[in-house]
Amino acid sequence: MERITVYTAQRIYTMDPGRPVASAIAISEGRIVSVGSLESMQPWLRRLPHDIDDRFKDDILMPGFIDPHTHLRMSGTYMGLHYVGPITSHAPSGPQAPLASRDAVLVRLKELVEATNDPERPIITWGYDPGMQGGHLDRDMLDAISDTVPIWVLAYAPHIVYTNTPMLERTGVTEDTTAHGIGRYPDGRLNGWFIETSAVGTATRPVIKDVYRPGFGQEALLHQAKVAVQNGVTTVADMGWGFESFEREWDDHMAVVNQPDFPLRILMTPFEARLNGKYGDDALDYLKSMASQGTDKLSVHGVKFINDGSYPSMTLRLNFPGYLDGEVGLTGETPWAEMVARMLP
């Protein structure tokens, strides 16, 4: 064992019911040797060289929090877009003000359309929350803002994209399209909704170079890591690896997470529908090969199956009485019986 460093504090909260509170913690080689008091760890300190570090003597320490469901790279990337959400967004460029209602969002979208000097370039926004801002957007609402400039709005929980007619036309979706997650009005017309991962992918393809800008993935990770640490989080699981690209996402994480000063451990959990779609019967072999490349700070863990939507986006599948607008949500793109079969060993 290398030299021990002992950090003292006013109080240290532990996760050990036998010793829930301590006043010192001994570390060596990046691992905990002992938690207790300077007196209780004397058996170690008498035998091994050590230093006492009292920089935290007036502070209260606690274990780092674990966030089991994040999308740091994805979320950080979206923060580079125009924001139309209901709470303040702490983007890399600075705090972005919230919009309280759907009407306020429509006003903001109109401002963005009027400010553009390129009517061929889509207005790309993110953060809309139908539950908090007064209900869903739709094609007719967005067409009333502009029926010439393409408008693309991603929900805060990114399970829905809302589009106007010019943007809808760029996706290639027509009235004859029968793909899962393509929204329609009660009369059968396309309503500009793209619901859940497959449909969101369809809506994103025409703007993918604007959403996932080159080099922004690593910058997004660095920014989101700062946000996490400011809130006491030290370990996260990315529950959507592969949504954009397995290779690009992994490379960005490897380049950033393993830097000595990067403050998080990240567990990468692949999105099963993308994994199966790309690798098929070789999916498990691919995961094993990627797991072998993992490090202490970046590892592969589990597989994510999505069977329905998102509660904030009001696409989560509900039984009676459903949502206030009468909808009951949507199943995922993979039929449930098929999903169960793919879960089995």
What feature does the model see in each segment?
Residues 288:
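Glycine-/acidic-rich phosphate or pyrophosphate-binding loops and their flanking alpha/beta elements
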